[in-house]
Amino acid sequence: MADRRRQRASQDTEDEESGASGSDSGSPARGGGSCSGSAGGGGSGSLPSQRGGRGGGLHLRRVESGGAKSAEESECESEDGMEGDAVLSDYESAEDSEGEEEYSEEENSKVELKSEANDAADSSAKEKGEEKPESKGTVTGERQSGDGQESTEPVENKVGKKGPKHLDDDEDRKNPAYIPRKGLFFEHDLRGQTQEEEVRPKGRQRKLWKDEGRWEHDKFREDEQAPKSRQELIALYGYDIRSAHNPDDIKPRRIRKPRFGSPPQRDPNWIGDRSSKSHRHQGPGGNLPPRTFINRNAAGTGRMSTSRNYSRSGGFKEGRTSFRPVEVGGQHGARSGETLKHEANYRSRRLEQTPMRDPSPEPDAPLLGSPEKEEVASETPAAVPDITPPAPDRPIEKKSYSRARRTRTKVGDAVKAAEEVPPPSEGLTSAATVPESTPPAAKTGNWEAPVDSTTGGLEQDVAQLNIAEQNWSPGQPSFLQPRELRGMPNHIHMGAGPPPQFNRMEEMGVQSGRAKRYSSQRQRPVPEPPAPPVHISIMEGHYYDPLQFQGPIYTHGDSPAPLPPQGMIVQPEMHLPHPGLHPHQSPAPLPNPGLYPPPVSMSPGQPPPQQLLAPTYFSAPGVMNFGNPSYPYAPGALPPPPPPHLYPNTQAPSQVYGGVTYYNPAQQQVQPKPSPPRRTPQPVSIKPPPSEVVSRGSS
């Protein structure tokens, strides 16, 4: 490249002039420099000039005359654009010189134009007082620096002067010892601390984001640290968040909770019986605390009061009473129409049970006097009217039902203790039962009444069951149902009812150990060993449940008299095997009752009903009798064994039902099985009593 340039320089006639002009115009990078260089043919001038940036060349050309400059630029640049591939970098003169060669081929045609341009450049240089010969050397730098084209100074000079002088080995990117100091990765490199320190301030000065309002949402403000007034809290949260201990403030929220089975217990408490809740939970010990129960216990005035007393005295009923106190109040009258009540009350019980119970039980206790009993007897027909008012009470009962369930487990133990005095409680019941026996309808209305007297209660229950049966299928089905349903129908009617059935079953099972068990089954509140007999109650309850089932069936509208009940009994039997298999599924039968009615039609004449007997149906006592006779040890041994016994026995009768009837219950029970699990959560506490029953049975 240098040789070619030299040749060009020697060949060009305008060596120095063109050289000067070339050096002047050569400052343009590739295109401009090469064009002017080739045109001028200035060898020495073209080389340094070509190293200069294009900017210099452009400035020079602008200085040159317009015509020559435009022609020169058009030719050189167009060619440069075409042949620009030869030019690799702005800093290498060799490439620029190549460009010159390429252009030099065309120089002949261009020389004229370029010579004009060079002349113009020379004239401009002369105007500046620079000599052409000097233009190759210092003149170029001086002149261009004066022109503002300092960059035209040869890159070599620039690099030689600036690069080596100012760049250290670690600062020269071309030097292997170069230390990068910029970039995220090197910002913490301590090897060049002095410069890094200099650079860091710059970075510090920059703020990529603003923190001014960053913590406004969570800022500590002294004026906000003082406790807020109640008005402020209510304005902020809608209620006083600090009053969790204050039932008045929280009632609305707690009232919402009772939607669930167990919450109903809480709900009634929230409704205004928090103390009564504790009383209910106290169960047997809480006889006094449940004011309504206390009134009824003290009053012992009526069958209803008896049933309430049972809850009181029975401790079993205690929990139950808790769930049934209102039931007693509005329900004793409604008990005659208990079936309807159960349906409506079970639903409303949970809602109203606690509040209703508290208010209604107390007045009911006095009202429950023997007159109320008689009332119940008379109300058996008039149960429907009573049912309407009791429905609210029963709703309370509903709540208390789940509560009763829970308290029952607790109460079951206490009730066992207290109910080992069940004869006395039953004595109380007996006292009430004596009059109650007079109005079996009343007893029917008060499904709890059967528990009144163990023996008398059983007989009365049988009679009442008969009456209830009679009344039941007709118009009192609701009343008897409540009694029988009490364990079963209530559960049937209310979703949570089945779990209560276990409670009743427990009560029944507890009483099943004794002659009064059946009546106690009906009047679960009195059951002496409420919890342990759970299985017994389930076992007998299965037989009894048939009655209950029948009750529910009647409730469902199976007003058919004992025969359908028998069918129900059979189905209950069929169901019983399932309960035997699934003691806690005995509640499952509850849902089955609705399903059972069809099976009832199938099994009414079948042997199972015979074994269970229509009496079994209408007389839970009969069932108890059957259970007790069938299982003399059923009371004690029955609890665990009875499930097997009941199951096989039920199967024996099921041989009859073993055909379609058995399948129907099985299928039905399959459906109940889901429901038993639902109930099971509440009766979970009841399961242990069955084990106790097993131990008792084994003993």
From Swiss-Prot:
Keywords on this record?
ADP-ribosylation, Cell projection, Coiled coil, Cytoplasm, mRNA processing, mRNA splicing, mRNA transport, Nonsense-mediated mRNA decay, Nucleus, Phosphoprotein, RNA-binding, Spliceosome, Stress response, Translation regulation, Transport, Ubl conjugation
Give me the stretches of Gly residues compositional bias.
29-45
A molecular function annotated in GO for this UniProt entry is: ubiquitin protein ligase binding
Subcellular location, in the record's words? Cytoplasm; Cytoplasm, Perinuclear region; Nucleus; Nucleus speckle
**Compositionally biased intervals (Polar residues):** 137-154, 303-312, 427-436
Its PTM note reads: Phosphorylated. ADP-ribosylated by tankyrase TNKS and TNKS2. Poly-ADP-ribosylated protein is recognized by RNF146, followed by ubiquitination.
Bias-annotated ranges (Pro residues): 586-596, 637-646, 673-691
Q: Name one GO cellular component term.
A: exon-exon junction complex
**Quaternary structure annotation from Swiss-Prot or TrEMBL:** Identified in the spliceosome C complex. Component of the mRNA splicing-dependent exon junction complex (EJC), which contains at least CASC3, EIF4A3, MAGOH, NXF1 and RBM8A/Y14. Identified in a complex composed of the EJC core, UPF3B and UPF2. The EJC core can also interact with UPF3A (in vitro). Forms homooligomers. Interacts with STAU in an RNA-dependent manner. Interacts with DHX34; the interaction is RNA-independent.
- Domain comment, in the record's words? The coiled coil domain may be involved in oligomerization.
**Under which name does UniProt file this protein?**
Protein CASC3
Q: Which organism is it from?
A: Rattus norvegicus (Rat)
